């Protein structure tokens, strides 16, 4: 006990001297707190206010100078039993109040430092941030590192270092560099830990703090490892996917091929009512697409290399169809279509309530050249309607040449009853001539609400005899589309002439429709292909344009123009814009139509077919063996001139 009192009394005197040397007139309030020693004896100490930061710095310097004096007064035995105490701020939000209490209230307690002056240095922190500076180490570098440490628990471990040598090792630790890079320095100010430290002055708790584990356990604080984990952030690698882009390869071809196209036509005729009012009537002659069965032609048509993908590119040509609307009341006996499953609509009717002798007409056409580019086809056809001998044509007959158009494409062979998409383009001149307007839908149906029952009777009185011829080809490969335009022309000689005389008085023109006179009038059909990924609609002065898109067929557009010519059957091909006013005395008119589509149709394994309907002047041309053979031979010669491997079959003959 005597040795303890011998150490305690000089310590109190020294503390009193230091307090007097650094005190100021503004320091007044003090209170006593217990000082806990190893034998549970209490000694009163003082609490006083601190001066500004300049005086506090001076105080710290003085304390460091007194360290050797206090160290010499302490023996080796008393150093191990020294007091365990650290200083904490009594108020978190106060900048001036400091306590000189020797009570230790930390989560980890250790032995006290042997230097009493270091205890005084710990009591001079004005606020929470300076408290951390004063309690850690007398070296400024380590103090700065501790002020920005985000974990309050690690600060308490720094304050309880057992020896000055251990404090020096803390200042040379490599963790301060990571502590300075911590992103949360503000957490020290808002940490509730200092308040909990100031509210535990119980001596009994201090006794338990003196029995804390060895200082080596203090150096194993997990706080630096947590700081290292905070610096780890995920790395996003999404920029690589954004740099991926597709490249489209285009190919160009330029070849010359034979023609493989025929055209569908509609022959508008004029019916005169008893009141001499013009009525428009229509009869149809339809053909399909004639396909070339040679596979090499299709391989070289739309590609310039021998790759496997390029071999699948073929051509699917459109067929230009001109026909009148089909009337639902026509029975299968009166209909001239030989095969209902083929989906070809063909009829003859008169759009007038009164029956009269219609005029006669002759259709002649010829394929001149085909322009192909990247599997996209554009067809230009010219139709000539020549006046028959002994028939007087009215002025409105030429306007009837502006006809209603239908597009016919080859359906896939898997369909039992294929449906052909249609688009209707009706000229404005026909509307002024008394023809009802026709409605167009995506399915190709046309409104016939303007047809009356009296018209039905007239249509049933018309008689016609038809013959159907089917042309089959070899299967094609899958189709494709390229993007760069290249044009190629091929001149095709020869003429496919289809005669047709409309009306019930066909016998008068029997001699005129003989096959020997078929070449007297012919016009050219121009087939053009251009590269285009989408459909294009072309517009002229008095035409009505229409285009549509379905799932099973590519998009296309169609428009019509008209041109007036003389009565001479040898008509030159002339493209002019149709005038809204009909000519004064026309005897022959020509109509030109274009179609453009992207060829993506796959005809399938069974190949395509061509359904040809021929209306002749006399039933003897079909019933008599010689006349029928003559007709078939002529068709065979014309088709074989373009496609050597075409197969022809005579389907049926129907009588109206």
UniProtKB/Swiss-Prot annotation:
Sequence repeats lie at residues 180-188, 189-197, 198-206, 210-218, 219-227. Residues 604-656 are annotated as: Interaction with MET. Residues 171-227 have a biased composition (Low complexity). InterPro entries: MUC20. Glycans are attached at residues 366, 570. GO terms for molecular function: identical protein binding. One of its GO terms (cellular component) is basal plasma membrane. GO terms for biological process: hepatocyte growth factor receptor signaling pathway; positive regulation of apoptotic process; positive regulation of MAPK cascade. It is found in: Secreted; Apical cell membrane; Basolateral cell membrane; Cell projection, Microvillus membrane. Residues 180-227 are annotated as: Approximate repeats. Residues 399-603 are annotated as: Involved in oligomerization. Interacts with MET; oligomerization increases affinity for MET. This is Mucin-20. It comes from Mus musculus.
């Amino acid at each position: 006990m005597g040795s303890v009192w011998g150490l305690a009394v000089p310590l109190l005197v020294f503390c009193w001297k230091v307090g007097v040397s650094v005190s100021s007139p503004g320091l007044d309030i003090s209170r006593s707190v217990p000082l806990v020693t190893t034998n549970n004896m209490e000694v009163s100490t003082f609490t006083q206010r601190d001066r500004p930061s300049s005086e506090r710095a001076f105080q710290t310097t003085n304390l460091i100078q007194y360290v050797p004096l206090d160290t010499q007064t302490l023996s080796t035995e008393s150093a191990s039993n020294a007091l365990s105490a650290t200083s904490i701020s009594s108020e978190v939000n106060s900048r001036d109040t400091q306590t000189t209490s020797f009570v230790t209230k930390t989560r980890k307690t250790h032995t006290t430092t042997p230097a009493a002056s270091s205890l005084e240095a710990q009591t001079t922190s004005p606020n929470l941030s300076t408290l951390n500076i004063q309690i850690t180490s007398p070296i400024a570098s380590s103090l700065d590192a501790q002020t920005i440490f985000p974990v309050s628990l690690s600060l308490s471990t720094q304050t309880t270092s057992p020896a000055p040598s251990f404090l020096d090792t803390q200042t040379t630790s490599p963790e301060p560099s990571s502590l300075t890079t911590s992103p949360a320095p503000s957490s020290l100010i808002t940490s509730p830990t200092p308040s909990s430290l100031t509210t535990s002055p119980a001596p009994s708790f201090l006794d338990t703090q003196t029995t804390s584990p060895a200082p080596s356990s203090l150096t194993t604080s997990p706080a630096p490892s947590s700081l290292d984990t905070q610096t780890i952030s995920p790395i996003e690698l999404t920029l690589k996917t954004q740099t991926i882009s597709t490249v489209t390869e285009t190919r160009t071809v330029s070849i010359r091929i034979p023609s493989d196209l025929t055209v569908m036509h509609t022959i508008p005729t004029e019916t005169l009512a008893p009141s001499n009012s013009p009525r428009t009537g229509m009869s149809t002659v339809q053909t399909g697409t004639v396909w070339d069965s040679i596979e090499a032609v299709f391989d070289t048509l739309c590609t310039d290399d021998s790759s496997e993908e390029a071999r699948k590119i073929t051509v699917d040509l459109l067929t230009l169809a001109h026909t009148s609307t089909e009337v639902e009341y026509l029975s299968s006996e009166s209909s001239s279509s030989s095969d209902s499953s083929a989906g070809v609509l063909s009829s003859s009717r008169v759009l007038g309530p009164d029956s009269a002798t219609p005029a006669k007409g002759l259709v002649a056409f010829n394929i001149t050249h085909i322009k192909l580019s990247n599997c996209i086809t554009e067809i230009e056809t010219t139709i000539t309607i020549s006046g028959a001998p002994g028939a007087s044509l009215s002025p409105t007959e030429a306007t009837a040449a502006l006809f209603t158009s239908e597009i016919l494409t080859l359906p896939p062979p898997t369909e039992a009853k294929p449906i052909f998409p249609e688009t209707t383009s009706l000229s404005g001149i026909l509307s002024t001539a008394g023809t009802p307007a026709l409605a167009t839908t995506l399915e190709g149906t046309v409104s016939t609400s303007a047809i009356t029952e009296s018209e039905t009777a007239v249509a049933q009185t018309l008689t016609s005899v038809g013959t159907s011829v089917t042309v089959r080809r070899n299967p094609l490969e899958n189709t494709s589309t390229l993007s760069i335009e290249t044009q190629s022309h091929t001149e095709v000689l020869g003429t496919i002439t289809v005669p047709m005389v409309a009306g019930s008085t066909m016998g008068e023109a029997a001699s005129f429709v003989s096959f020997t006179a078929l070449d007297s009038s012919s016009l050219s059909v121009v087939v053009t292909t251009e590269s285009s990924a989408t459909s294009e609609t072309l517009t002229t002065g008095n035409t009505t344009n229409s285009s549509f898109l379905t799932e099973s067929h590519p998009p296309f557009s169609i428009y019509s123009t008209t041109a007036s010519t003389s009565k001479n059957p040898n008509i030159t091909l002339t493209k002019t814009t149709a005038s809204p006013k009909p000519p004064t005395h026309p005897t022959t008119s020509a109509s030109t139509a274009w179609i453009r589509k992207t060829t993506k149709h796959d005809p399938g394994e069974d190949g395509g077919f061509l359904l040809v309907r021929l209306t002749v002047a006399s039933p003897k041309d079909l019933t008599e063996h010689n006349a029928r053979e003559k007709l078939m031979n002529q068709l065979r010669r014309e088709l074989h001139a373009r496609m050597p491997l075409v197969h022809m079959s005579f389907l049926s003959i129907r009588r109206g």
